[in-house]
Amino acid sequence: MNANPKFLSADAHVDAAAVAPLPNSRKVYVTGSQPDIRVPMREITQADTPTGFGGEKNPPIYVYDTSGPYTDPDAKIDIRAGLPALRQGWIEARGDTEVLPGLSSQYGLERAADPATADLRFPGLHRHPRRAQPGKNVTQMHYARQGIITPEMEYIAIRENQRRAEYIESLKSSGPNGAKLAAMMGRQHPGQAFGAAAFGANALAEITPEFVRDEVARGRAIIPANINHPESEPMIIGRNFLVKINANIGNSAVTSSIGEEVDKMTWAIRWGGDTVMDLSTGKHIHETREWIIRNSPVPIGTVPIYQALEKVNGKAEDLTWEIFRDTLIEQAEQGVDYFTIHAGVRLQYVPLTANRMTGIVSRGGSIMAKWCLAHHKESFLYEHFEEICEIMKAYDVSFSLGDGLRPGSIYDANDEAQLGELKTLGELTQIAWKHDVQVMIEGPGHVPMQLIKENMDLQLDWCKEAPFYTLGPLTTDIAPGYDHITSGIGAAMIGWFGTAMLCYVTPKEHLGLPNKDDVKEGIITYKLAAHAADLAKGHPGAQVRDNALSKARFEFRWEDQFNIGLDPDKAREFHDETLPKDSAKVAHFCSMCGPHFCSMKITQDVREFAAQQGVSETEALKKGMEVKAVEFVKTGAEIYHRQ
């Protein structure tokens, strides 16, 4: 997209690649108890099994869909107008918010009055911001603790279930072998959940709205849903739900425009980003964020200290509580769903980093450490934490308590500074919960595999099971350019142990700002890690997609293999590099083994022979061996023959 500001406002558009439906997929909606609860899912159509393999019907499978209206051909996409306000009616019906006459942050008012920003501003519908009425608390946690099941909670329950029960029923009615097929496709290995909800191997275990409410009330899950982001589709972050992933985007002082960041957001959610963090540190942070939020169907997170630092020209020592407070209100009124706040970086912990290999690597952590040292005072984030809670509960902004002292190398993993901060984050969690403010805890970082579980166990203990949100962790430091892999290994492990959301890492980590291709690579890598964790935990229905793809692979349904996978485009591209013809899409082999050495084709031949002989597959193999033994003796019982 052209970076020219005038072009942006006049002709801004979404990338065509981000709105095209995925192959053999369509957007479907499942309606809840009221007509305006319409939960999106992606339906993947499958071909029938070839006659030679049984000829049964393969019903569509349903997968979690984060792409919002962008992949719905019936939706009118205009990023200048933004997305429909999906939750507006639910928010209004609760009767506990008020519409403000205008912006109440000083900086927001200044930007709105500045003629230099006119061409950069979001041109769509300008709703006045909402805030809780005096004395009211509008957080999803508050409602949950009052015993209220909100529409958001019902929406989430439907979304997490992914129509598993309907899929199994459709298998049962697919033909004479339907019951057998349903049992096979619904089979799932028991998981090891490390104290999380024990669903076992029950693929049909249902996530109910009441279960969602209870998990939020306990603080074990959060629903990031600012009342000023009504465009968002409700989702949940907690270890008893599907593991989620976050994608980071954002401009810097040296690269990227507003248009490019909107493109990255729509691209990230196409491939499975459950939330997006705008980490912009360059020009026009306020305007960039407005465009992103108004066009985002997923929760948006930020690190407010980044923008506060820009307001004091990059001088950390000039930061004040008043500037930071105004920044929180500014962003809350725009609709940011969760704030990363590094309130655990206390003055007493800063000296503990002196002997580290890589010091303080968190931007937010280093900003607050510098402020503490410059003033030799306790962090104003820590000192004013209760006041921050008052702001959060007025808009339902969730805390993402930042790990400002996370290790930046495996050398520094699990050291005194990191664990001291984690203990403080646990204390702050208890304070936030007194205000019914939702909390998740950020985690490392760089941690070798043998130390990962200790991180998870300490977090569960000290933070009382508040959701854990980790960056990786990276399990080795030797692979610049491949840190999506070094971190994907750690992400799969810590997701299995109980982490609720994984922050993606792209191949550009430590090297540069990611482009769209890097964003996709990071997303797919982390979707894979999250799914592997769901399988290992034994999450209900986690294996359905694996079973469907494996069946398609065994039956040489190549198109279904591509389409059920996380990245149909890459799978098709790799296959077509060596077998590009359409005939290869129905062939009973690939270029790996060729037509004569395909193990799956050989297995099919054994099954066909068994069916012809009216014997079991084991007996068929035995008969085949006997025939070959007779042939061996008749030809002279020689191992080798001259040609």
UniProtKB/Swiss-Prot annotation:
Keyword Iron-sulfur: yes
Catalytic activity: 5-amino-1-(5-phospho-beta-D-ribosyl)imidazole + S-adenosyl-L-methionine = 4-amino-2-methyl-5-(phosphooxymethyl)pyrimidine + CO + 5'-deoxyadenosine + formate + L-methionine + 3 H(+)
Keyword Zinc appears in the UniProt entry: yes
Ligand binding (substrate): N248, M277, Y306, H342, S362, R363, G364, D403, G404, L405, R406, E442, Y469
Entry note: cofactor: Binds 1 [4Fe-4S] cluster per subunit. The cluster is coordinated with 3 cysteines and an exchangeable S-adenosyl-L-methionine.
Enzyme class: lyase
Cofactor(s) of this protein: [4Fe-4S] cluster
Residues that coordinate or bind Zn(2+): H446, H510
Gene Ontology process terms (BP): thiamine biosynthetic process; thiamine diphosphate biosynthetic process
UniProt keyword annotations, A-Z: 4Fe-4S, Iron, Iron-sulfur, Lyase, Metal-binding, S-adenosyl-L-methionine, Thiamine biosynthesis, Zinc
Residues bound to [4Fe-4S] cluster: C590, C593, C598
Subunit structure: Homodimer.
Family membership: Belongs to the ThiC family.
HAMAP family with a match to the protein in the record: ThiC
Name of the featured protein: Phosphomethylpyrimidine synthase
Species name: Burkholderia orbicola (strain MC0-3)
Record lineage: Bacteria, Pseudomonadati, Pseudomonadota, Betaproteobacteria, Burkholderiales
Gene (name only): thiC
